[in-house]
Amino acid sequence: MNYLHLLMLFETIFVIGSFYALKKDILAPSFLAGCSFWLSALCVLLNESKWNVHLLKKTLLILVFGQIAMFLGDILATKVPVLRKKDKETIEKEKSMEYKPIFIQNGKNLFLFTFNTALFVYFAYSILKKGFYMNAIIDAHRMQVEDGISEMNVFVQQSFRFLIVCALVYAFILLYNRIICNKKYQHDMFYSLYFNALAIIESVLSASRRNIIVMLIAWFFMTVVLWNVKNGWQFKLSKKLIRKTGVIVVITMVIFRALHTILKGTQSNLTSFYDYVTYYIGCPIQSLNIYLQRNVQIHRSPYWGQFSLPSLMKALKRIPRSVETTFDYVYLGGGANAASNVYTFFLAPYLDFGFMGCMIFSFVVYFVLSLLYTKAVKNRNMTYSVARNTAILGFIYWITLNSFYFCPVMFVFAPTGLISVICFWILFVFLFRIRFN
């Protein structure tokens, strides 16, 4: 029996079923995760002969039941009642709410412009002080661990996170004025693009593509939420949005392909764009499969959360700093001549908590994500608190579309993730001293 074909069949049924079960909400966490797994399974199927793929029954069961657990957590969260009900006066007030454009005082814009520019220059200097050559950037990549650029100055590390927060908050302002108020302001465009460009350049200089993915998914999330608000949460998936999303995905993959060539060289046969895209998207499932082939008897991690929540556990001193919390590379097999060290969302909790623990972990993560989305953002008018929630949730929503790749929870539920959320709160207070409604 070909378990890979069964996986592809399951992914197709799962995507269609979750789409309708979750009322055609394209932002439903388990639906987005299902789409990413469907695409990953397709890329493995396209390379079945080349990679000599023989999917294990165990791999199939982990992927199938893991996604079912995600879906159950998602759909259960939609059934949780709202704890604080609105009175009639509040409901009527929100129905008649008139949205006005957001204007940020020039002094605040200039302060953040100067502050972030100065920190960016210092960051770039820290990377390139040995000379402007690619080895300096590669060295920066080697300095990274699961929690970021750990060996750099602490102030430099946190400034990077604050810059990303600024980039996303100004992206929200740009999208809000454009979508909700149908207004185009040059200063919105300038500051939003400037802060986002700085954040992307810093990501490239630190040899990390992760933050670029975080920002792109946040832009996508905020755009869809604002379109829903404008249309009374009666949003329908349009061909225009699909086309734009497709173009952005292609451009992103081209950029990632270029970064892969620059930073990792060309010691593989991933010479074509097609090979790279199918490798990048499909390798996690094959890596998981190979890991399970080589490790028939799985022994649970000696430390709770060693692989799924390493940064948090180390910060709480539940895991010694010297304990290894990352995975080694494995070759994909066959004629791939390529390696991977990403194993989908499920391997980390599987090693930490066993099969049932992995299912519970997946259920809880997607229950929390869905609860935050459905209760703090969905079907709400764009008040100050909802705007803040949208920006923060956009920042962590990359968990959904990256679940096919690895376990992003380790980065979100980490000290740096908490610092970033605090930065969102501080920046919203700084920019919007009074609520806009």
Question: Where are the predicted features?
Answer:
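N-terminal "leader" segments that precede or initiate the main folded domain
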Residues: 1-102, 106, 189-199, 215-259, ...
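Hydrophobic alpha-helical transmembrane segments
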Residues: 2-16, 52-56, 104-111, 157-173, 188-199, 351-372, ...
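Membrane-helix boundary/interface segments in integral membrane proteins
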Residues: 12-21, 201-205, 367-377
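Alpha-helical transmembrane segments of integral membrane proteins, especially early/N-terminal helices
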Residues: 19-37, 73, 114-130, 174-183, ...
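Membrane-embedded catalytic interface detector for glycan/lipid assembly enzymes
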Residues: 79-236, 252-262
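Small-residue-enriched transmembrane helix-hairpin modules in multi-pass membrane proteins
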Residues: 140-156, 247-369
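Hydrophobic alpha-helical segments
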Residues: 341-437
